[in-house]
Structure formats: structure tokens, C-alpha cells
From Swiss-Prot:
Residues 38-55 have a biased composition (Low complexity). GO terms for cellular component: extracellular region; membrane. It comes from Mycobacterium tuberculosis (strain ATCC 25618 / H37Rv). Residues 1-57 are annotated as: Disordered. The keyword Transmembrane applies. Keywords: Membrane, Transmembrane, Transmembrane helix. The lineage of its organism: Bacteria, Bacillati, Actinomycetota, Actinomycetes, Mycobacteriales. This is Uncharacterized protein Rv2203. The keyword Zinc does not apply. The chain crosses the membrane at residues 75-95.
């Protein structure tokens, strides 16, 4: 009668049974090379584009991607805009200089300038205080509330003028310098009769500052150009 089965089938009564030899059908173990030569690297190099990328700042972090810089483009646009503004300002200045005399020629021509200066000199000769004050205030006459000091100055100016001349007549406008469309400086010649007596003199020059306002030409100031005693 056979005895109980052994828990280890490999162990019998006659000793341990040998392990079966591997058959030819079983896969053989792969032998890895223990020494890799320098001619054959263990891993093939990556694409050429990977070499151009900058190294990562930290391990495991992908390299930074380089974006195209727009600084050069913005600088070029700024230069173009600045040149355009300078060109526009230059053209405006040149246009204003060229058209200044043309726009003011009708207002400050010799005729209106001569009439305004003659009227102011007549006011000094005749002691017309209101006309002297209106011209001397140079456009702000209507806004000034107290004109007593201006009237006193007008009387003094008239007295000084009458001590020099008994009669004055503007004979020519020698030069007009335009400051703007509404302002001009005028050099003129007048024939004067000295208050002390004597023959008239016709080569006396004066300078007047004119202002055009509300259709009127005002003589803001008057200076005798020729020195001498009358």
C-alpha cells in the first residue's frame, strides 16, 4: 500500500530529482556589453535643433523659448513719428512767415498806417485827451474803469508835443515791420513846423507801434526818431 504523498514532489525516497534542463524553445538570456567604446555611444544624439536650445535653469524644467524682439521695430516707429512732427512744425512756421505779410498787407498798408499816425499826431497837437488815451491804452480802453492817471499822462504828452511843434504832417511811410496779423512797427517821415518859429522841416522821422482791433488802427506808442531842438 503506498504511503502518503510527499509535500515536495521533487524530493523522493531516492533523493532530490534534478531540475529539467532548459529546452531549445525557451528564450536565451541577453548579454549586455560590459564595455562601450567611444566610437559607439550608448545613446544616439538628438536632432540638431535640440542642441541650439539653451540649457534648462533647473533639472526637469523645459528650456526657455526665445521670442522675437520688437524693440527695434518700436524704436523705428518712434523715429518716423518724431521726424513727421518736426517736418509739420517746420512747414507751419515757413507758411506763417511767408503769409504774414500777405495777410496783414491790407490792414497795415501805407494808407491806413499814415491815416492812423496823422490822427494821433493831430490829437497831440490839439490836446484831444480822449483820442490820446484810447490810442495809448492799446486795445484795453473799454476794460479800464479808472482812466484818470491815463488822462493826466495824455495831457503831459500833449503839452510836451506842443512845445516842440506847432504843426505836423506825415509825408511818407518808410518801412513797415509786421509782428503779427494785428501788430506792426512803422517808420515814417513827417514835415514839422517848430513851435519856436522858423521854416518847416521835412526830414523828421518817427516810429509808431500800431495795433489793429475791431476795424480800427490804434497808435500804441510814438517816438521821435530825429534828435534836435525845436
Amino acid at each position: 500500500m503506498p504511503g502518503p504523498h510527499s509535500p515536495n514532489p521533487g524530493v523522493g525516497t531516492n533523493g532530490p530529482a534534478p531540475y529539467p534542463e532548459p529546452s531549445s524553445h525557451e528564450p536565451q538570456a541577453l548579454d549586455y556589453p560590459h564595455d562601450l567604446g567611444a566610437a559607439e555611444p550608448a545613446f544616439a544624439p538628438g536632432p540638431a535643433d535640440d542642441a541650439a536650445l539653451p540649457p534648462a535653469a533647473y533639472p526637469g524644467v523645459p528650456p526657455q523659448v526665445s521670442y522675437p524682439k520688437r524693440r527695434h521695430k518700436r524704436l523705428l516707429i518712434g523715429i518716423v513719428v518724431a521726424l513727421a512732427l518736426v517736418s509739420a512744425m517746420t512747414a507751419a512756421i515757413i507758411y506763417g512767415v511767408r503769409t504774414n505779410g500777405a495777410n496783414t498787407a491790407g490792414t497795415f498798408s501805407e494808407g491806413p498806417a499814415k491815416t492812423a499816425i496823422q490822427g494821433y499826431l493831430n490829437a497831440l497837437e490839439n490836446r484831444d485827451v480822449d483820442t490820446i488815451v484810447r490810442n495809448a491804452l492799446c486795445g484795453i480802453h473799454d476794460g479800464v474803469r479808472d482812466k484818470r492817471s491815463d488822462q493826466a499822462l495824455a495831457k503831459l504828452s500833449s503839452d510836451a508835443f506842443r512845445k516842440q511843434f506847432s504843426q505836423v504832417e506825415v509825408t511818407s511811410i518808410d518801412k513797415i515791420v509786421y509782428w503779427s496779423q494785428y501788430q506792426a512797427q512803422v517808420l515814417f517821415t513827417m514835415q514839422v513846423t517848430p513851435a519856436a518859429g522858423g521854416p518847416p522841416r521835412g526830414q523828421v522821422q518817427g516810429i509808431a507801434q500800431l495795433l489793429f482791433q475791431r476795424g480800427q488802427v490804434l497808435v500804441c506808442s510814438y517816438v521821435l526818431r530825429t534828435a534836435g531842438s525845436y
